[in-house]
Regions:
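Conserved Class I S-adenosyl-L-methionine
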Residues: 3-6, 10, 20-21, 25-28, ...
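A generic alpha-to-beta junction signature in SAM-dependent methyltransferases
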Residues: 39-41, 65, 139
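Class I SAM-dependent methyltransferase SAM/SAH-binding core
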Residues: 46-106, 130
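Conserved hydrophobic residues forming the short capping helix/wall of the S-adenosyl-L-methionine
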Residues: 65, 87-88, 166, 195, ...
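A short acidic, Gly/Pro-enriched loop at the edge of an enzyme's catalytic core
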Residues: 104-115
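A short SAM/SAH-binding and catalytic strip from SAM-dependent methyltransferases
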Residues: 114-128, 151
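Conserved catalytic/acceptor-binding region of the Class I
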Residues: 129-130, 136, 140, 144-216, ...
Length: 278
């Protein structure tokens, strides 16, 4: 899959990521904090965020690095960049700049950033090794590259419970494990191997466990999930209104245990891989 294909797939999702940006920020804040910790973010740093989605972790890191530091917030989709820019303006965050670009062709000089991060973006890079090489190129010597990705589907009911319902109605077909998808790097060691191949040193891998939480109901969860995922939107579009209503009912029932007191709480596991630029 080319960069153009990936961009087109995400372009339609951008409006929904903007719509649900506050919920998404809350859902993944524990992962954002873990990424900040493993990346060694601190005051005064220059940080590059790749595939920022609707503005995170860029806007959180901006607070960590403070006025003496800076964050460059990038995404392959211009609409995502504009959502992040609007959120920064709303929150009066001034130490962030914004740039539309792809991970495998970064428009920055070599040795520009103390830290380069990507939260839940690396799985969708058309050429992960080329992207990792580019990210290392723009990192300063001895600087850190830190990438967060989903662990295995079966460890993440936020995903697999929904998939289980959908697959009862639509044949999922054969999946290419190396094609851009959420669980492309779910196997421990796979992303670390990419980073090593790209030339990183001191490559380390850590499993992060947390709860995906937000003050939303099961029905609101399904509304969000079915909108922000281009894969789900495409599958649901093939079904009749009656079939879609049946899936909604089945998803609500299937996720009930993860909504105590009508509040979302899914256990989750992610993988964070870090490496240094020699």
């Amino acid at each position: 899959m080319t960069s153009e294909n990936v961009v087109e797939a995400w372009r339609e999702s951008a409006q929904y990521w903007a719509k649900h940006s506050d919920t998404i920020r809350k859902m993944f804040m524990p992962l954002t904090r873990a990424l900040v910790e493993h990346a060694g973010n601190h005051e005064g740093q220059a940080v590059l965020d790749i595939a920022e989605g609707a503005g995170e972790p860029s806007l959180t890191i901006a607070d960590v690095v403070g006025p003496g530091g800076s964050v460059t917030c990038t995404d392959a989709v211009q609409e995502m960049v504009e959502t992040a820019r609007s959120e920064a303006q709303r929150r009066d965050i001034t130490n962030v700049r914004f740039q539309q670009c792809t991970a495998d062709s970064l428009p920055f000089p070599s040795d520009s950033f103390d830290v380069v991060v990507s939260r839940l973006g690396a799985m969708f890079f058309p050429d992960p090794v080329a992207a990792a090489c580019e990210m290392l190129r723009v990192t300063k010597p001895n600087g850190c590259l830190a990438l967060a990705v989903w662990h295995k589907s079966e460890l993440n009911p936020f995903c697999h419970v929904v998939t289980g319902v959908i697959d009862r109605h639509i044949n999922p077909g054969a999946a290419d494990p190396d094609a851009p998808n959420a669980f492309r790097f779910a196997e421990p060691g796979k992303l670390a191997g990419v980073m090593t191949e790209a030339g990183a040193s001191d490559v380390k891998e850590q499993v992060v466990k947390f709860n995906i939480e937000a003050p939303i109901s099961a029905l609101e969860f399904w509304s969000m999930r079915s909108q922000i995922s281009d894969t789900l939107r495409d599958k649901l579009a093939k079904l009749s209104a009656g079939e879609q209503a049946q899936i909604t009912s089945e998803v609500e029932q299937a996720v009930q245990e993860f909504f105590p007191a009508n509040q979302m709480r899914f256990p989750a596991q992610m993988i964070i891989v870090t490496g240094k630029k020699p």
